[in-house]
A protein has these predicted regions:
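Residues at alpha-helix caps and immediate loop-helix transition turns in enzyme cores, especially N-
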Residues: 39-40, 68, 101, 143, ...
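Conserved catalytic-core segment of nucleotide-activated headgroup transferases in glycan assembly
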Residues: 2-94
Length: 207
């Protein structure tokens, strides 16, 4: 692991609505909009069009410009996605409310070739698994590294078709989804991903 993530002393409760209370499966990405490449939009559009789902987007931890948001809406519409299936969330002012937004999401979709870092740590902390793309260098392997440390290699896609297949498969598999929520949070907190003390100690010794 190249990094360890510190988190608030008091975490929001994990409260993912039951399927019967949600008409649509919810994908989501809170990554910086600048990371949402055309290839990423292409695959996300295929996923939403071919499933009973919607996708929540939020520009990291600050509001995106109107121009950037409208550009994203146009790119999804150009690929046949209904505008009401792409939901933009406003930035919350405090970390507790920000993290609570992950309760809206069933599966986080990572961007590529540049994946999320903070957002991926936040997602697993809130019990939401992250589907990421296998990378080819340090900058593109952050999501891959996080999932490997969680023994979640099945959430690392080899290519765009594999990414699509895994996203649809997760939506349709209730048995897999039952393994997450608080179980994923506990697993993450006991992993090297959030062990800042030992990470700092090891890094200092190397210096």
């Amino acid at each position: 692991i190249w990094n360890a993530f510190s988190y608030p002393a008091e975490l929001p409760s994990i409260n993912h609505p039951a399927k019967k209370d949600k008409p649509l499966f919810s994908y989501g990405s809170f990554n910086n909009f600048a990371k949402i490449s055309d290839d990423t939009i292409e695959v996300w559009s295929r996923i939403v069009k071919n499933s009973n789902s919607q996708i929540y987007l939020k520009n990291s931890q600050k509001e995106a410009s109107l121009e950037l948001t409208e550009n994203l809406i146009k790119k999804f519409k150009d690929r046949g996605v209904q505008e009401n299936k792409v939901i933009f969330l406003e930035t919350e002012k405090n970390i507790h409310d920000h993290l609570s937004l992950y309760n809206k999401i069933d599966l986080s979709l990572d961007t590529f070739p540049y994946p999320g870092v903070t957002t991926s740590f936040e997602s697993v902390l809130m019990g939401v698994p992250v589907l990421t793309m296998k990378g080819h260098n340090l900058n593109s392997r952050c999501g891959e590294s996080i999932n490997i440390n969680l023994e979640m290699e099945n959430f690392i896609a080899k290519n765009k078709d594999d990414y699509f297949d895994k996203a649809i498969s997760f939506q349709n598999n209730l048995d897999i989804k039952k393994n997450f929520g608080n179980n994923l949070r506990n697993k993450a907190l006991s992993s090297p991903l959030f062990d800042t003390e030992n990470f700092t100690k090891d890094f200092t010794e190397i210096l």
